[in-house]
């Protein structure tokens, strides 16, 4: 009997104190007392607090719960759309329920307990909000609430994705828990997507948590809140859900075409002479590259944006030299300022620092972190960059340590200090959004001739609207971490922020003379070729990280993939326009295109690069084959042209020089001429590869390659349609124009087959040559 009692007690304690299960303790029911219809939704008075549903569109519903009757006003930072067009919706009220219906959704609120059930128009349950709670608490001296939502998942087999980039090596978060908190290598975005065809945008900037460790229960919670606030976004396709997120938080602008080329970087170039020498050698060797990067410690002291003259005697001349050689230069800039400089003293006097503390072994005591929440401090920060760097021609901004960097999560500077906006814990995840907005808005106000490009180590919801890409942080240089980058990048991309890259080869260590490390670098570079951005970086034992640093055999392979990247620029740049204008995502987990195929739910090491390419990174040393799942479709081996039917797994050939790549039937892939930088020559002729076996469409996009005239309509598109039944290709009338546009061009049409239209090299015998002058042409096989 005693043993039985002990077991009961142990079970009870485990239930009460298991992480995430505290919210599952019994709470009194919170019935609906009254309902008020408003112009854009309904407000329900509850026994405890109030619940409000706002109909934003047919597929987007905002849900808010307040512990008091009123909904306090607050300043929005993440969501920038507050004026929604009128949407037709209906409300039905019975003794048991209140139902809000749109053309796509039905939302059922139970009167007995105020639970909320989201259904599609057919009545299929998508998501259930079973309970919400707001628990009074004190955080960083502020009286506030801990917010939590509970959803029961009994009988649901859905998978969960998104939440930003995390390094656990997990793609499908079913059965997992994730801290939504910023730190080096973990980028948190409060946006969750379900294979049931919906997304939840959790509108809170404090440290939060997703917890599904108990498979039949989902908890979403935040440390600081006045109101529990989220948006329910319905697809069911993921592109539509992501499009809804961007409608809320902003669309990503186009980068300059150069940004989609190759980025050469290492830790670090130490002198002007070294940097220019590397750039000149790339041009001498005719290796394609657009961008070179100056990492940290170019300054004479941190926070003072002045080059160390002993190592960089002529910064304007250096930039001019790079531009003459068709390079763009990105430079590292940090949010920390060192005592003892004029800039530090001036910022301190103005109250522009959040805190002054030791934040790491390489930072001196009393380092100041600028207050990116202060609009005047943001202007000041950009002005430093503008006067010292942008005005001499710098092209891109590497914003490092934008979490901001701290010793650990528990001593996060924001959590324990006050900002210009108030309690830092309330805005703990928002620093990267605010600091990228400082640079984006600053450069946009300074010039419209050069598109903003920011590479940030962290991001938050909305950062995509600031022209911000991210890299995956300071990851190790080994196979384990390489493998983890694939699901990390896929989850970041599906979180609505489309531009992601990684330190090819890893950041921490790596010896280019070591044959084993060379293999890792090659495989990582092959993967990186099909990332939204192609970039090498790292700390190498030889201090060499250029493509010729890895030996002649490796160099041949690396340059071949670099060449492929440049041939694919018409395809990649057109995808970038789709991303800006249509809510598209270039790097796509298989579930994005094959959501109803249950076998794709947990495949996080294969992905689609745009509509055509399935990419299958090789993540095991010494591998010569790669187990690959092909969803139901006809697929072509990119290297051989051989076709294979899907809905099965195969062992794809994967010798060191070949990354397994398959192209889906119905794809139309434009490949441009080989070039050494993105704008060396016009995209003419274009080899147009047609992968027969299904109908297909593709739209080629072109503009001036830089500047913001595209926002004013200065761009052109050409639509291609393949009709598989008729075996005919229609090249439509060109739409739009811009200065410098090609008015006449040649399309080399290639109907891909075995050993025809394959690999990197242009097809020597195209099937059709089409002279195009902007008017529709129909091409038959």
Segment roles from a protein language model:
Residues 1-9:
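Bacterial N-terminal signal peptides that target proteins for export
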Residues 23-249, 253-258, 265-267, 274, ...:
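N-terminal accessory segment at the very beginning of proteins
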Residues 8-20:
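Bacterial N-terminal signal peptides
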Residues 124-658, 663-664:
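Catalytic-domain carbohydrate-binding cleft regions of carbohydrate-active enzymes
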């Amino acid at each position: 009997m005693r043993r039985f009692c002990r077991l009961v007690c142990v079970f009870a304690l485990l239930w009460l104190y298991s992480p995430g299960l505290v919210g599952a303790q019994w709470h009194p029911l919170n019935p609906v007392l009254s309902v008020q219809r408003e112009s854009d939704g309904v407000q329900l008075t509850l026994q405890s607090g109030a619940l409000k549903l706002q109909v934003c569109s047919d597929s987007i519903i905002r849900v808010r719960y307040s512990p008091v009757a009123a909904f306090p006003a607050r300043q929005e930072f993440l969501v920038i759309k507050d004026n929604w067009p009128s949407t037709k919706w209906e409300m039905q009220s019975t003794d048991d329920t209140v139902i809000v219906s749109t053309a796509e959704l039905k939302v059922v609120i139970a009167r007995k307990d105020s639970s909320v059930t989201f259904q599609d128009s057919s009545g299929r349950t998508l998501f259930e909000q079973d309970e919400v709670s707001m628990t009074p608490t004190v955080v960083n001296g502020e009286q506030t609430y801990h917010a939590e939502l509970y959803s029961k998942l009994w009988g649901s087999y859905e998978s969960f994705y998104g939440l930003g980039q995390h390094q656990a090596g997990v793609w499908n978060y079913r059965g997992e828990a994730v801290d939504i908190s910023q730190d080096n290598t973990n980028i948190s975005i409060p946006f969750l997507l379900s294979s049931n065809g919906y997304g939840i945008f959790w509108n809170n900037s404090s440290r939060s948590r997703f917890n599904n460790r108990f498979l039949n229960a989902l908890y979403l919670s935040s440390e600081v809140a006045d109101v529990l606030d989220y948006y329910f976004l319905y697809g069911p396709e993921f592109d539509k859900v992501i499009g809804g997120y961007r409608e809320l938080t902003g669309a990503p602008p186009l980068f300059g075409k150069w940004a989609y080329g190759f980025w050469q970087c290492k830790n670090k170039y130490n002198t002007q002479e070294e940097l220019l020498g590397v750039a000149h050698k790339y041009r001498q060797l005719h290796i394609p590259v657009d961008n070179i990067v100056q990492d940290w410690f170019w300054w004479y002291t941190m926070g003072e944006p002045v080059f160390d003259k002993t190592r960089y005697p002529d910064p304007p001349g250096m930039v001019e030299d790079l531009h003459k050689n068709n390079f763009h230069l990105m430079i590292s800039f940090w949010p920390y300022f060192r005592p003892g400089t004029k800039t530090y003293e001036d910022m301190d006097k103005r109250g522009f620092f959040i805190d002054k503390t030791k934040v790491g072994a390489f930072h001196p005591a009393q380092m100041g972190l600028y207050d990116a929440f202060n609009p005047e401090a943001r202007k000041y920060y950009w002005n430093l960059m503008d006067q010292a760097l942008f005005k001499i021609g710098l092209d891109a901004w590497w914003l490092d340590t934008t979490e901001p960097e701290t010793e650990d999560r528990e001593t996060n500077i924001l959590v324990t200090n006050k900002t210009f906006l108030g309690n830092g814990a309330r805005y703990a995840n928002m620093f990267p959004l605010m600091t990228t907005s400082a640079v984006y808005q600053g450069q946009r106000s300074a010039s419209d001739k050069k598109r903003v490009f920011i590479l940030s180590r962290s991001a938050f919801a909305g950062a995509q609207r600031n022209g911000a890409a991210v890299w995956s942080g300071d990851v190790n240089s080994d196979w384990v971490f390489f493998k983890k980058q694939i699901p990390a990048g896929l989850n970041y991309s599906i979180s609505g922020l489309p531009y992601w890259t990684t330190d090819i080869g890893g950041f921490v260590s790596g010896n280019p003379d070591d044959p084993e490390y060379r293999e890792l670098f090659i495989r990582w570079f092959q993967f990186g070729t099909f990332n939204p951005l192609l970039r090498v970086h790292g700390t190498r034992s030889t201090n060499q990280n250029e493509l010729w640093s890895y030996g002649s055999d490796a160099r041949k392979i690396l340059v071949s993939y670099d060449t492929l990247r440049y041939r694919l620029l018409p395809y990649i740049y057109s995808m970038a326009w789709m991303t800006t204008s249509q809510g598209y995502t270039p790097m796509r987990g298989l579930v994005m295109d094959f959501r109803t195929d249950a076998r794709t739910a947990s495949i996080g090491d294969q992905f689609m690069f745009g509509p055509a390419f399935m990419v299958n990174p090789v993540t095991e040393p010494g591998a010569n084959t790669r187990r690959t799942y092909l969803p139901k479709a006809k697929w072509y081996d990119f290297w051989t042209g051989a076709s294979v039917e899907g809905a099965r797994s195969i062992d794809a050939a994967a010798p060191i020089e070949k990354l397994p790549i398959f192209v889906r039937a119905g794809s139309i892939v434009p490949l441009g001429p080989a070039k050494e930088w993105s704008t060396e020559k016009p995209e003419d002729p274009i080899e147009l590869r047609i992968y027969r076996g299904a109908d297909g469409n593709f739209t080629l996009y072109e503009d001036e390659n830089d500047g913001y005239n595209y926002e004013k309509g200065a761009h052109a598109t050409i639509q291609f349609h393949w009709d598989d039944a008729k075996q005919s290709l229609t090249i439509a009338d060109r739409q739009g124009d811009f200065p410098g546009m090609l008015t006449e061009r040649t399309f080399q049409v290639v109907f891909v087959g075995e050993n025809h239209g394959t690999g990197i090299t242009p097809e020597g015998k195209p099937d059709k040559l089409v002279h195009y002058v902007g008017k529709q042409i129909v091409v038959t096989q």
